[in-house]
Regions:
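Beta-strand-dominated extracellular/periplasmic modules and repeats
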Residues: 2-131
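Extracellular/luminal ectodomains of metazoan preproproteins built from arrays
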Residues: 25, 29, 156-166
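C2-type phospholipid-binding modules
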Residues: 113-161
């Protein structure tokens, strides 16, 4: 009887371990592509506080890049995407580069450029200038879809830009 209980405990532990790994995104068999998404918006400091914090406008054609490095800090992948009319961008990144598995935590996403005539100064809100690493856990993990949803990156007008220290 004790042996049966012990075997059931071992089996349950193994099943829980497999479920846990899949939940945190460390083991997803068959996934060849990871998806990255976020928004690019314009934030105008000349507006009132309420409009400034909640009245940001989407930037169509705002360019965002992803740079991934290997374990020796060499760049192994670079791509960019432009935002749509609503400011959304979505990139698909191959999970295997030159036969090696890409580690999402080694990828950095940042602002590149804005086509907007007046709202084209990148800000570091949500890491737009310095870049942001992908989170440890994907936002969406469903069947063969692995997606990392990043925050909103912001551009601002030249009038709002902080002068460089000199």
């Amino acid at each position: 009887m004790a042996r049966k209980v012990l075997m059931m405990l071992i089996a349950a532990s193994l099943l829980m371990g497999c479920s846990f790994n899949e939940a945190v995104g460390t083991v997803v068999a068959g996934v060849q592509v990871i998806h990255l998404g976020g928004k690019v918006m314009c934030q105008d400091c000349t507006k009132s506080y309420g409009e400034w914090t909640h009245g940001s406008q989407p930037i169509k054609g705002g360019k965002v890049s992803v740079t991934c490095k290997d374990d020796r800090s060499r760049i192994i992948y670079y791509a960019s995407d432009e935002s749509d009319e609503e400011g959304n961008f979505n990139m698909a990144v191959n999970k295997y580069i030159n036969g090696k598995e890409l580690q999402p935590k080694s990828c950095l996403v940042r602002l590149v450029s804005s086509p907007h005539l007046t709202c084209n100064i990148p800000t570091n809100f949500a890491g737009g200038i310095t870049g942001v690493n992908l989170p440890v856990r994907p936002t969406v993990l469903y069947r063969d879809l692995v997606q990392y949803q990043l925050g909103t990156f912001f551009y601002t007008t030249p009038r709002c830009a902080k002068p460089a220290a000199g």
